[in-house]
């Protein structure tokens, strides 16, 4: 299965009538493996900051998580594995695998829990597969 099919079929899937607004799988170096249409154009330093938070959990909390210039307030995640952010009625979940970052961005009516499930479950699978 191609990475684009993974984004289209697994990350943008329908959950109780809701789905992610944007999704992407990117390398930990910031290279895009696959992304949804109109995924925010992120800056290399934003990915560097995300990777730094995985290596030093809590480093994003004072400044916020930026993705495509949008600031998200960092909320409780799983240190070294998952970063979660909130902005108004929506938010973002970033799951780290061995080689990639899986990113899901959502808005209401999707819930944070639905976003977490959609992003983290495939992430766990990719970890099991060596990615």
Swiss-Prot record:
The keyword Amino-acid biosynthesis does not apply. The keyword Cytoplasm applies. It is found in: Cytoplasm, Cytoskeleton. Its main location: cytoplasm. It comes from the Eukaryota. CDD domains: PROF. One of its GO terms (cellular component) is cytoskeleton. Keywords: Actin-binding, Allergen, Cytoplasm, Cytoskeleton. Transmembrane segments: none annotated. GO terms for molecular function: actin monomer binding. Occurs in many kinds of cells as a complex with monomeric actin in a 1:1 ratio. Binds to actin and affects the structure of the cytoskeleton. At high concentrations, profilin prevents the polymerization of actin, whereas it enhances it at low concentrations. By binding to PIP2, it inhibits the formation of IP3 and DG. Belongs to the profilin family. This is Profilin-1. The gene is PRO1.
């Amino acid at each position: 299965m191609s990475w684009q099919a993974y984004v289209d079929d697994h990350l943008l899937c329908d959950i109780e009538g809701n789905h992610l607004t944007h999704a992407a799988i990117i390398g930990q170096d910031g290279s895009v493996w696959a992304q949804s249409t109109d995924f925010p154009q992120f800056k290399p330093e934003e990915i560097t900051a995300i990777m730094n938070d995985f290596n030093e959990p809590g480093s994003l909390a004072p400044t916020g998580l930026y993705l495509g210039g949008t600031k998200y307030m960092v909320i409780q995640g799983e240190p070294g594995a998952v970063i979660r952010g909130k902005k108004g009625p929506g938010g973002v979940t970033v799951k780290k695998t061995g080689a990639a970052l899986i990113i899901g961005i959502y808005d209401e009516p999707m819930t944070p829990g639905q976003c977490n499930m959609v992003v983290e479950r495939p992430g766990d699978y990719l970890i099991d597969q060596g990615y």
